[in-house]
Every structure is written in C-alpha cells, then in structure tokens.
From Swiss-Prot:
Negative regulator of FtsZ ring formation; modulates the frequency and position of FtsZ ring formation. Inhibits FtsZ ring formation at polar sites. Interacts either with FtsZ or with one of its binding partners to promote depolymerization. This is Septation ring formation regulator EzrA. One of its GO terms (cellular component) is plasma membrane. Belongs to the EzrA family. Keywords: Cell cycle, Cell division, Cell membrane, Coiled coil, Membrane, Septation, Transmembrane, Transmembrane helix. Residues 22-567 are cytoplasmic.
C-alpha cells in the first residue's frame, strides 16, 4: 500500500514540475518575441532621415548607404530569421523536447543581443556624424574670430614680436588655408575629416595665441632687463676690484660672457618660435644672475666680518693667553698641595699646545689680510673655523680650572666631614659617661679603638703633601662606616644595660618567694658587673617572665615614659 502511494506522489510531482517548466519556457518565448518587436520599432529610419539634411556626397553618402543597408538587412533578413527560430522553439516545446528548445532559446537570445548592439552602433554613429557637423560649424566661427584677432594684433604691434613676427606671419597664413580646407571637406560631405581639421586648427591657434602673449615679455627680458643686470654686475665687479676686493676666484668676466651668449641663444630660439625652450633659458639666467649678485654681496659681508672679527679675535687670544698663565700658576700651586692625575696634567699641556697653534693660525690670517691677495669670503671661512676652535679651547680651559677649584673645595668638604665624625664620636662617649656604666664590653672597646683609628687615618691623609683626594675620600668612607657603626652600638648597649638594671630591680619583689627567680637574677647581676649587658638583660627577663608573663613589656613601657619626660 505504502509503495503505491509513493509511486503516485512521484508521478503527481513529475506532472506538476513538467507543467511549471513548460510555462516558464513559453514565458521566455514571449519575452524574446517582445524584444524582437522592440528592435524592429527602433527609430533608425528617423535618425537616417536627419543625415539626408547634410550634403549627401562623399563620405556622408557612403556612410548613409552602409547604415541603410545594415538596417534593411536587420529588418528584412535577421529579424524574420529570429521569428522563424521562435516558431521552431514553440514546436519543440509542444513535442516535449525541452533540452533542444532550451538550447535554441539561448541561441535566439544571443542573436538578439548582437542585433541590439548593431542597432545601437548605427544610432551612435549617425549622432556622431550629425553632432560633429553641428559642433564644427559653431567652432569654426570662433576660430575665424580668433584668427582675425591674432592677425590684427600682429599687424598693430609687429615691433613687439621682433624677428619672430615673420614666422608668426607664415604660421597664421598656413592656418588660414585650413579654413578653405574645412569648407571644401564640408561641401564634399566629409564631415568627420572636416572635424579633424577643426581640432588641428584649434590646437594651432591656441599655440600661436599663447606665443603672441609670451614673446613680447620674453623679448623684453632678453633685450633689456637681463643685459642691464649683466652690465650692472660688471660695473659692481669693477668697482669692488678698485676698492681692493680680491675677486679672481669668481672668474666674473668669463661668467658674464657666458650669460651674454646664453641671451643670444635665447633670442635665436624666439626667432624660431621655440618659446618653451626660451622660457626655460630665461628662468635659468635669472637664477644664475641672482647667484652672481649673491656672490658679490657675500664678499662685501665677508669683508665686514673680517674687519670686525680680527680685532675681537686678537683680544680673545690675548685674554686666553693671560688666563692660561694664571691657570699655569694655579696648577703649580695646586700641584704642591694636591696629587694631580697624569691625565689632568696631560690635559693642561694639550691646552697650552692648542693655544700656541691658534695664535700661530691667527697671525698667518693676519698676514694674508695685510697682503690683500686672498678673497674675503675665504678669509671669513678660516676665521669662522678659528672662532669655533677658540670656543672649544675656552671650554676645555674652563673645565680644567673648575677641576682645580673642585680639588680645593673637596679638601674643605673632607675637613668638614672629619669634624662632623669627631663630634659624633664625642657624642657617643658622652652618652656612655652619662649612663654611668660599670665598664665597657670588650667588643665595644675594640670598635671604639677602630673608630678612633679610622679618624686618625683621615687626618693623616689630609696632612699629606701633595694631597691625594681619591685616597682621602676612600679613608673618609671607611671612617664614616666605623663611626656610624660605633654610635649605633653605643645607643644599643646603653639601652640593654638600662633595661637589664630595671628588670633586675623589678624582679627583686619575687626574690624571697621564688628561689629560681633569685638564682636567675643573681646570675644576671654577675653578668652586669662583668659588662655583658646583652646577656644580663636576657637572663633577667627570663627569670622575671617565669613568674610574671608580660613583666618585661611593663618595664620597657615605664622606661620609655621616663625617657620622654627627660627629653
């Protein structure tokens, strides 16, 4: 039973699918039919009718014939073929030959697409021809006006174009012939060729108009402005030479001649209407002439610099020499009192050597200024180098002097530090005296002796001649560590002794009742009398805490309160 249902359902499904598919194929036939009718109704005849308004000769006639034949072929042959194919597709569908029908419909769609492009191309070409004829007619009038204006300007202002006027004449006459050519081509119906003539004319007249704007200005530069600047440069150069400037290195006469030749070259280019090249050369010439002005101005500025810097540098070097002498005396004095490292002495000798070299260079420059054979710009360069070297040397010299002063300052600081440590040691001993201890433990006595020895070592280093500051600093570091350690040890020892004494006193209340406490306290007293305050405190605390836990905290608290009252 189930199997029969499945077969039935599958059969029903196949029938439905078959029906839907056929319907879709018929719809596609209708769409292609509509497309074919649409193509047949395109306004190609109307477009071709517009062409007939033009001169139906030459190129236009040939094009019209080609388009008309193409359209006739589409309407009479190609579209009826499509109609035939659509009819075949319908027959195949009726016979349920779907695959063949589908393939045929695909071919029909491709054919219609190609026909669509062909029709589009015909309409586009027709519009291009008509458009180019309209545009050319409008533009040729504008170009005639531009040509007339150019001829008028050339006639009225011929002198402003110099020798370029003849070639401009030739070019404008050549352009005039193109108007005749345009008329002939239009008459012959060759509108597309006529359009090319319009575009060529437009370009040529644009070029000529631009040239006619630029030539007078360029001629002005080459015939008046630039030669005047060269003459001014030549005068300035001669005048400076007469005033004693050394300018041989500028090779000015040869350079000016080169510029004059360049101007001639530029005029020849204008004559040949090579205007862009001429503009380039004029721009270069302007830059080069500016550079020559700058060179002469540099010499004037360099002369001023040399005049003002020479006396200033002479003064600076004298001042440096005097300072170096003072430094030498100071170094000798310091050397007797202090130990100077070999590198420091070497630095001073190098400063001396540099100073002599700088003086020698300055005298050489002085001689060259007096000789008046060297350009001021070159002398200025040498002086600038000398100035930077003098500045460097001043800096080195200053560093050396600072180092000498630092040595003496370091000695004073070292003596101050030694005094401070002596005071710290005296303060530690005063605390010991004030606390009235029965005696000093041996380790403490050894530390005290060590601290005193370290202070004596610093004092001895400070008495040495010459003074070796790195060794003094080393001794100071060691003494500082020893004294600080001793002071801390003193405070700690006094605290332990006082707390031991107070804990023993506090524990006395338990002596009679507790033999163990008595024994512990007696031992603590024995240790106290033998200066072992740390162990005495430990024993006393252990004995008292045995019978009264927390007793040591109370003793400590009372002692801290007494201390704060005393302070």
């Amino acid at each position: 039973m189930g199997m029969a249902w499945i077969v039935l359902l599958l059969g029903a499904g196949a029938i439905i699918y078959n029906h839907v598919y056929r319907k879709r194929m018929y719809r596609e036939i209708d769409r292609l039919e509509e497309w074919k009718i649409n193509l047949m109704n395109r306004p190609v005849p109307d477009e071709l009718a517009k062409v007939k308004q033009l001169n139906m000769t030459g190129e236009t006639e040939q094009l019209f014939e080609r388009w008309r034949q193409q359209w006739d072929d589409i309407v009479a042959v190609k579209l009826p073929n499509v109609e035939e194919q659509l009819f075949d597709a319908e027959r195949l569908l009726d016979k349920y030959r779907y695959r063949q029908a589908r393939r045929l419909l695909g071919q029909i769609a491709d054919g219609l697409r190609r026909l669509e492009e062909e029709v589009h191309e015909i309409i586009h070409e027709v519009n291009e021809l008509i458009g180019s004829e309209e545009q050319s007619r409008a533009e040729i009038e504008e170009l005639r006006a531009a040509h007339r204006e150019a001829k008028k300007a050339l006639l009225a202002y011929r002198y402003t174009f110099g020798s370029a006027a003849d070639l401009l004449d030739v070019r404008l006459t050549e352009a005039e012939k193109q108007f005749q050519r345009f008329a002939e081509l239009t008459e012959a119906g060759n509108y597309l060729a006529a359009r090319d003539v319009v575009l060529t004319l437009k370009e040529e007249l644009g070029r000529l108009t631009a040239m006619m704007e630029e030539i007078p200005k360029l001629l002005g530069e080459c015939q008046t402005s630039l030669p005047a600047q060269l003459a001014e440069l030549a005068d300035g150069y001669r005048e400076m030479e007469e005033r004693g400037y050394i300018l041989d290195h500028l090779h000015m006469e040869r350079t000016l001649q080169e510029k004059r030749e360049k101007i001639e070259q530029c005029l020849a280019m204008i004559h040949e209407l090579r205007i862009e090249e001429a503009k380039q050369i004029v721009a270069e010439l302007k830059e080069e002439i500016d550079a020559l002005y700058d060179l002469l101005e540099n010499e004037v500025l360099a002369h001023q610099y040399v005049q003002t810097e020479m006396p200033r540098l002479s003064g600076m070097l004298q001042e440096l020499a005097a300072e170096a002498k003072e430094t030498e005396a100071e170094a000798l004095f310091v050397q007797q009192s202090y130990h100077l490292a070999p590198s420091d002495l070497e630095k001073y000798r190098s400063i001396e050597k540099q100073l002599h070299q700088l003086q020698k260079r300055f005298f050489l420059i002085q001689d060259r200024v007096a000789e008046a054979k060297t350009a001021y710009s070159l002398l200025k360069e040498e002086l600038e180098q000398l100035v930077s070297q003098i500045d460097l040397m001043k800096e080195e010299h200053e560093q050396f002097r600072t180092m000498l002063q630092t040595l003496r300052k370091d000695e004073l600081i070292a003596r101050e530090k030694l005094d401070g440590m002596r005071k710290t040691l005296a303060e530690a001993l005063r605390l010991v005296q004030k606390s009235r201890l029965p005696g000093l433990p041996e380790p403490y006595a050894l530390e005290l002796a060590e601290a005193r020895r370290s202070l004596q070592a610093v004092a001895a280093r400070l008495e040495e001649k010459p003074l070796d500051m790195p060794a003094v600093d080393q001794a100071l570091e060691e003494a500082k560590a020893a004294v600080e350690r001793l002071y801390e040890r003193t405070v700690e020892m006094i605290e332990q002794a006082t707390l031991a004494e107070r804990t023993i006193q506090y524990g006395n209340r338990y002596r009679r009742r507790y033999p163990a406490v008595r024994k512990g306290l007696e031992e603590a007293e024995f240790l106290f009398r033998h200066y072992d305050y740390e162990e005495a405190l430990r024993q006393a605390v252990a004995a008292v805490e045995e019978v009264e836990p927390g007793a040591f905290d109370r003793v400590q608290k009372l002692w801290q309160e007494d201390n704060s009252r005393e302070q």
